[in-house]
Structure formats: C-alpha cells, structure tokens
Swiss-Prot record:
One of its GO terms (molecular function) is proton-transporting ATP synthase activity, rotational mechanism. This is ATP synthase subunit a. It is found in: Cell inner membrane. It is a multi-pass membrane protein. The chain crosses the membrane at residues 3-23, 62-82, 88-108, 119-139, 158-178, 180-200. Keywords: ATP synthesis, Cell inner membrane, Cell membrane, CF(0), Hydrogen ion transport, Ion transport, Membrane, Transmembrane, Transmembrane helix, Transport. PROSITE patterns: ATPASE_A (PS00449). Pfam families: ATP-synt_A (PF00119). GO terms for biological process: proton motive force-driven plasma membrane ATP synthesis. One of its GO terms (cellular component) is proton-transporting ATP synthase complex. It comes from Sulfurihydrogenibium sp. (strain YO3AOP1).
Amino acid sequence: MEQHVIMALTVLIVVPVIFTIFAKKPSLIPTPIQNVFEIYIEFIDNLIKENMGEKGRKYFPLIASIGLFVFFGNLLGIIPGLESPTANLNTTMALALLVFFIYNFEGIRENGIGYFKHFLGPVPAMAPVFVIIELLSHLSRPVTLALRLFANMTGGELISVVLIMLVPFLIPMPVMLIHLIAVFLQTYVFVVLTTVYIAGAITHAEH
C-alpha cells in the first residue's frame, strides 16, 4: 500500500477518534486543544449560516469532516519522513470529485429539475451559449480544486526538503512556519469553496 494511502487512512481513523473524545468529555476549564476545536466548530457554523442560512446546518458534519481531513492531511507533510496525503493528486482529485458530486446531488435533491435551469442563463435566446459556459465552469471546479491543493502542498514539501538539505540548522523553523501557514490557508480555501459550491447548488431555485 502506498504511503499517501496509509497516511489518508491514518487521518480518517485517528482524527474522528480524537474529535469524539473531546466532544464527549469537554472540560469545564477548556484545554488549549478544546479551545481550538471550539473555534473550528464556530468557524464552520458561521460559514454555513452566512452562505446557506439555518437550512445549511445539515451540511455541517460533511463540511467540518472535509476540513479536518484536509487540515490534518496537510499537516502530516510538516513531519520529516511522512508524506502528506494531500500532496498526492489522487487524494486531492478524490476529494474534489466528492465535493463535485455532493453539491450537484444536493442541488437536484433540493430543486428537482429546476436545478438545471441556471445552466440556461437569463436570456432564452443565448441558452446554447450559456449551457456550454456553465458546463465548462462546473466541470473545471473539481480540477482546479484538486490541482490547487495538490500543487500548494507538493510545492511546500519540496521547498522544505531542499532548504533543509542546503542549510539544515538554520532553515527548518522558518520553513516549518511558512508550511504551517500554507496548511491553514489551503484548508480555509478548500472549506470555503466547498461551502460556496453547495450553497450555490441548493439556492438556485430561490434566485
């Protein structure tokens, strides 16, 4: 089994266990880890409410889970000798396709056949043109979502390795800090885009 698969499975198994432990036994005096999880939960909750309102709450487990997987998957790349699963195109493409199929499925489930009306555009005479544009736009989403995460994580790991090999005693900490910033940023981008895509799909009938 390839390392990126092992790392992905590790994240899928370990993170839910840790999250469940802290969710079931919250301390009266919050620990630093508990504070971090609470901040994350509040962030996801606010993001969903801003984009989908109260009806978007049912997507909280999905979006929060994707965010946790991406974050901890990215984070593994900081540890020497470990390969981040998100630095492998197979992983990021699988994630992106998951998001793609989910938001389209939810769009159809919420709006029925009306979901496809937005592909026709606002001007009936221009419908053939809008269909092509909308299809290309939607089909490009999983590709750009996957490539963005893959390229940033792969690039970050390669730069870290090269710099650490060149100047092993002076570079590691600054490089790790930069990589950590990239971990947070790419997780944020992936989660926000996932939320926006789902929101756009389920609210088309309202516009």
